[in-house]
């Protein structure tokens, strides 16, 4: 079995694959202060709850945008799973030609998403990932990573309003039924969520105009379904896109 780690700034998403089939997925909070033993015990508990033992994990692959955790998870993999993990980074085979000015600047998560989207949906394709940041990636018909956009995510927007104002409260991001609202919390929720929908549709329209009017649009990440319900430009939501991308990259790099 393959254990895949998608390490984001807010959450770590893990997936257990048997061949091409995703058996289980888990989401935990990202904590840079946890040791490799703490992560090892936590992962053991999560997979064990689903009837999988440590010895059944043959390989590990890691994608991380949190540098301090990379070594932690690598050591954890060696100690608890007795395997050297594949790490998404320079030198890894992705099948994607990155056209960024400096390819090393592209986050591992964006590369993984691009690989999955092109493999599953073909090109041209646009990937929107609703994470700590909301990112947009453009992949050409030939599978070239053309670039994209990085915007503040929904939680960052909510936190900024709370932290940078004297009277606005901290809120949960639930969608109000109307855009116009009569209380502060719902008004903030409306501005952040419906404002994000407007941003998404405008940016996707501009992206299509710049590189491919027929581009397919796939969304992923924690808020993807909520935004897709209101968006006029998102074609599909794939919550497991990043994990699928890790599986594909693993298959292209396993010995």
Curated annotation (Swiss-Prot):
Keywords: ATP-binding, Coenzyme A biosynthesis, Cytoplasm, Kinase, Metal-binding, Nucleotide-binding, Potassium, Transferase. Pfam families: Pan_kinase. Pathway: Cofactor biosynthesis; coenzyme A biosynthesis; CoA from (R)-pantothenate: step 1/5. Its cofactor is NH4(+); K(+). It is found in: Cytoplasm. It comes from the Bacteria. GO terms for cellular component: cytoplasm. Its EC number is 2.7.1.33. GO terms for biological process: coenzyme A biosynthetic process. ATP binds at residues 6-13, 132. This is Type III pantothenate kinase. It comes from Caldanaerobacter subterraneus subsp. tengcongensis (strain DSM 15242 / JCM 11007 / NBRC 100824 / MB4). The gene is coaX.
């Amino acid at each position: 079995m393959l254990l895949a780690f998608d390490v984001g700034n807010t959450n770590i998403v893990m997936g257990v694959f048997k061949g091409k089939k995703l058996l289980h997925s888990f989401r935990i909070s990202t904590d840079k202060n946890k040791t490799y033993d703490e992560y090892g015990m936590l992962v053991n508990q999560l997979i064990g709850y689903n009837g999988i033992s440590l010895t059944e994990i043959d390989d590990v692959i890691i994608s991380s945008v949190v540098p301090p955790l990379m070594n932690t998870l690598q050591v954890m993999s060696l100690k608890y799973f007795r395997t050297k993990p594949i790490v998404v980074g320079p030198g890894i085979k992705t099948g994607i030609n990155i056209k960024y000015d400096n390819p090393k600047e592209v986050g591992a998560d964006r590369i993984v998403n691009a690989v999955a989207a092109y493999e599953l949906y073909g090109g041209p394709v646009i990937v929107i990932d609703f994470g700590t940041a909301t990112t947009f990636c453009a992949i050409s018909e030939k599978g070239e990573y053309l670039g994209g956009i990085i915007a503040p995510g929904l939680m960052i927007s909510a936190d900024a309003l709370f932290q940078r104002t004297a009277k606005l409260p901290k809120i949960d991001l639930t969608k109000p039924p109307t855009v116009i609202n009569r209380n502060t919390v719902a008004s903030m929720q409306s501005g952040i969520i419906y404002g994000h929908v407007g941003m998404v549709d405008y940016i996707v329209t501009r992206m299509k105009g710049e590189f491919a009017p027929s581009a397919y649009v796939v969304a992923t990440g924690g808020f993807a379904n909520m935004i897709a319900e209101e968006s006029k430009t998102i074609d599909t939501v794939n919550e497991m896109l990043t994990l699928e991308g890790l599986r594909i990259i693993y298959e292209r790099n396993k010995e």
